[in-house]
Regions:
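C-terminal accessory "lid"/substrate-recognition subdomains
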Residues: 218-221, 235-263
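Conserved lysine of the Walker
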Residues: 80
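Classical nucleotidyltransferase
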Residues: 1-73
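The conserved Walker
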Residues: 76
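A glycine- and Lys/Arg-enriched "phosphate-lid" helix/loop adjacent to the NTP-binding pocket
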Residues: 47, 159-228, 242, 252
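Conserved substrate/cofactor phosphate-moiety recognition/catalytic segment
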Residues: 89-132, 234
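Hydrophobic positions on the alpha1 helix immediately C-terminal to the Walker A/P-loop
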Residues: 83, 87
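Conserved nucleotide-sensing/catalytic segment adjacent to the nucleotide-binding pocket
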Residues: 111-160
Length: 263
């Protein structure tokens, strides 16, 4: 402000104890606004200690700093996309779709076999943009359909080598909770998937686990083949992640309602 010739006349604050310091250090008078918190019973300290409880008081630009991220991983036809959509609905929040599928349709005419090594950095960058968008507008938690480890695993599977740009995003984007789905659900051919044999599915699952470990990424392995059991287990895991903050904000009967099929 000094460089631009701006001289403030007043400082507006709710902290009465700070007024003498502003006067002494800056020579500026302080105008106190609601110092007794009678109109707005909240403080910055309260928000920092318990951001989810006071979520509505946090500016939109600041909320992404507090958002928790949950990545759902798994091989082809493991139910990731459907599960992510259900979780986003039940927690009333955003999700990042799998950009790789969109890329194949928009750039390769829907032919996954046309993928080349040079495509994987573009896929990873698109996925990062999807993640950033989901986090920006999330309601406390954002769900991610497929992470960068999965993109790297497909690159290694199809191209025989890893991509350095994808690895850079693996290192940069560390999610708060990573859930790995066992690839033991019924295979559904959708025109894009090519790893449908039992051998291929198991091989890719092993590759995912190996790459998670090599990148020092902790994950929770959900092994049930039952879709409902998977869903309920993931709800539990997310509730544990958000812990007491979520319990104060969400309905206490969230899980019980899910079990009863009300959500």
């Amino acid at each position: 402000m000094n460089e631009k010739g701006i001289v403030p006349n007043f400082i507006y604050s709710s902290e009465s104890q700070d007024a003498p310091h502003y006067r002494e250090q800056f020579g500026i008078e302080t105008i106190l606004i609601d110092p007794e918190r009678s109109f707005m019973n909240i403080s910055g300290r309260q928000i920092r200690r318990d951001p989810f409880r006071y979520w509505d008081y946090i500016p939109t630009e600041v909320k992404p700093f507090f958002v928790r991220t949950v990545a759902i991983l798994g091989g082809e036809s493991s139910g990731k996309s459907t599960l992510v959509n259900k979780l986003a609905n039940i927690f009333n929040t955003t999700s990042a779709w799998e950009y790789g599928r969109d890329y194949v349709f928009s750039h390769l005419g829907g032919d996954e076999m046309a993928l080349q090594y040079s495509d994987y950095d573009k896929i990873a960058l698109g996925q990062a943009q999807y993640v950033d968008f989901a986090v920006k507008y999330a309601n406390k938690v954002a769900f991610i359909d497929t992470d960068f480890v999965t993109t790297q695993a497909f690159c290694k599977k199809y191209e025989g080598r890893e991509h350095p740009f994808v690895q850079a995003l693996i290192d940069e984007y560390r999610f708060d909770l990573v859930i790995l789905l066992e690839n033991n659900t019924p295979w559904v051919a959708d025109g894009l998937r090519s790893l449908g044999s039992e051998r291929d599915r198991k091989s890719f699952q092993n590759l995912l686990e190996q790459m998670l470990r090599s990148n020092n990424i902790e994950y929770v392995h959900v092994e049930s083949a039952d879709y409902d059991e998977r869903f309920l287990r993931c709800v539990e895991l997310v509730q544990q992640l958000l812990a007491a903050d979520l319990q104060r904000l969400a309905r206490p009967s969230l899980l019980s309602e899910a079990r009863e099929g009300q959500l």
